[in-house]
């Protein structure tokens, strides 16, 4: 079956996770919030049903890279954490507002500034 999930680093894995210490540090140092997300390799394949299933599992967002970064980092014995930003809101039912891109340049620059500040802070603790 072509659509069968391919597991290259683990025989069975449902969730990939950031390093706990880095996650605590980034939320503490930057005062940001921590939420679960879904990481998928299916570009533009979300359906209303999938969106609801993911939300029912506690996910507040969808991205395409985080799972791979966390899985490979763990496999290689490296520590990893992700800082993500909400850029849009997908509809969860046919009555929801139409999808619209909401990210601004100011939001992008702010995220980069926060990431640099975090990298400097953890580098100074070594």
What is each of the regions a protein language model found here?
Residues 12, 59, 102:
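A short glycine/serine-rich beta->alpha loop
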Residues 21-31, 72, 114-122:
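Generic non-transmembrane alpha-helical segments
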Residues 17, 21-24, 49, 64-68, ...:
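Conserved active-site and cofactor/substrate-binding residues in soluble primary-metabolism enzymes
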Residues 14-57:
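Active-site rim beta-loop-alpha module in soluble metabolic enzymes
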Residues 49-89:
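A C-terminal functional module that forms or caps the active site or interfaces directly
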Residues 2-3:
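Short, small-residue-biased leader/transition segments that mark boundaries at the very start
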Residues 90-126:
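His/Asp/Glu-rich mid-to-C-terminal helical/loop segments that flank catalytic regions of hydrolases
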Residues 8-9:
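Alpha-helical transmembrane segments in inner-membrane proteins
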């Amino acid at each position: 079956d072509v659509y069968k999930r391919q597991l290259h680093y683990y025989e069975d894995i449902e969730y990939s996770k950031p390093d706990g210490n880095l996650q605590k540090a980034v939320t503490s140092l930057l005062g940001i919030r921590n939420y679960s997300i879904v990481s998928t390799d299916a570009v533009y394949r979300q359906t209303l049903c999938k969106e609801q299933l993911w939300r029912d599992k506690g996910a507040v967002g969808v991205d395409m890279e985080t799972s791979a970064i966390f899985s490979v980092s763990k496999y290689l014995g490296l520590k990893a954490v992700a800082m993500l930003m909400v850029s849009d809101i997908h509809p969860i039912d046919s009555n929801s507002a139409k999808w619209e891109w909401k990210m601004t340049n100011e939001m992008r620059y702010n995220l980069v500034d926060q990431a640099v500040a975090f990298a400097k802070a953890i580098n100074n603790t070594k």
